């Protein structure tokens, strides 16, 4: 028999290997499968997702549960480990919080910045490192990301904000592993994850993890091994928010 054909992105038609079993390995960060995806997914012989969260997301959209399997992602536990080299973080002080990801509405950095700068001030011995990018890693995108971060800090604590450091460079996996080991806690107030790779890497590196208690990271982060934050689900029907976050639309 022909070997399965595993798809990581939607092909144009079924002409590549028309007789081979077709498996789609996919994810999404909301509680519904996007409607434009449904017909393509239904045409697959098998659908694999990273998390129970997406198993439920796909099922409630009408895809038969027996068509959906779960194949969690693996990480290099030798690289992402408490043991290994650290890095010197210039201008950091005291207890170091680390957050990372693309600076989008879904990652919800604004809520994290608000909580941090309202809880602490420049008198506290703490640092928040924001390892983020916004659209890319060029100088232009780094400037845009840094400006968004500065604006958020200024809005929520214009007088005496605690220390916030921004790192917008693209780095190697080894440098990222060293950054985890050089921090004291990983925190991200995400609105939704289909995978939650940063959480997995941080936890494997031995960091306490503060996270939203919903979506894919709930597969491996529990109240027993992390610090889940309470959340509230809302319908995304505000036009102004839809304009800011089009990638979250399901139709």
Report residues per predicted region:
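Short alpha-helical donor nucleotide-sugar binding micro-motif in glycosyltransferases
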Residues: 177-183
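Aromatic "clamp/platform" in nucleotide-sugar-dependent glycosyltransferases that forms part
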Residues: 191
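Acidic anion/phosphate-binding donor-loop and adjacent secondary structure
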Residues: 35-36, 74-90
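Conserved donor-binding/catalytic core segment of Leloir-type glycosyltransferases
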Residues: 90-107, 113-116, 128-130
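Donor nucleotide-sugar binding/catalytic pocket of nucleotide-sugar-dependent glycosyltransferases
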Residues: 45-56, 64-82
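Nucleotide-activated donor-binding/catalytic signature segment of Leloir-type glycosyltransferases, i.e.
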Residues: 139-174
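Short hydrophobic beta-strand element within catalytic cores of glycosyltransferases
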Residues: 208-211, 221, 227-229
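Extended catalytic core of nucleotide-activated donor transferases of GT-like folds
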Residues: 1-62, 175
């Amino acid at each position: 028999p022909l070997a399965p054909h595993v798809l990581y992105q939607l092909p144009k038609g079924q002409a590549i290997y028309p007789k081979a079993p077709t498996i789609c390995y996919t994810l999404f960060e909301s509680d519904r499968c996007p409607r434009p995806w449904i017909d393509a997914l239904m045409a697959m012989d098998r659908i694999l997702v990273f998390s129970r969260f997406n198993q439920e997301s796909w099922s409630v959209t009408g895809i038969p549960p027996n068509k959906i399997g779960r194949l969690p992602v693996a990480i290099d536990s030798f690289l992402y480990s408490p043991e290994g080299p650290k890095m010197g973080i210039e201008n950091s002080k005291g207890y170091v919080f680390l957050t990372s990801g693309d600076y989008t509405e879904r990652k919800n950095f604004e809520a994290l910045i608000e909580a941090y700068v309202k809880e602490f001030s420049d008198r506290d011995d703490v640092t928040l490192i924001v390892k983020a990018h916004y659209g890319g890693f060029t100088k232009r995108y780094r400037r845009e990301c840094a400006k968004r971060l500065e604006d958020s800090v200024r809005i929520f604590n214009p007088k005496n904000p605690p220390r916030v450091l921004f790192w917008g460079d693209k780095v190697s996996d080894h440098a990222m592993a060293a950054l985890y080991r050089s921090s004291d806690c990983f925190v991200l107030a995400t609105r939704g994850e289909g995978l939650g790779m940063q959480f997995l890497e941080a936890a494997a590196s031995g960091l306490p993890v503060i996270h939203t208690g919903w979506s894919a990271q709930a597969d491996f982060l529990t109240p027993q091994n992390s610090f889940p934050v309470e959340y509230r689900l809302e319908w995304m029907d505000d036009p102004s928010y839809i304009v800011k976050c089009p990638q979250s639309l399901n139709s």
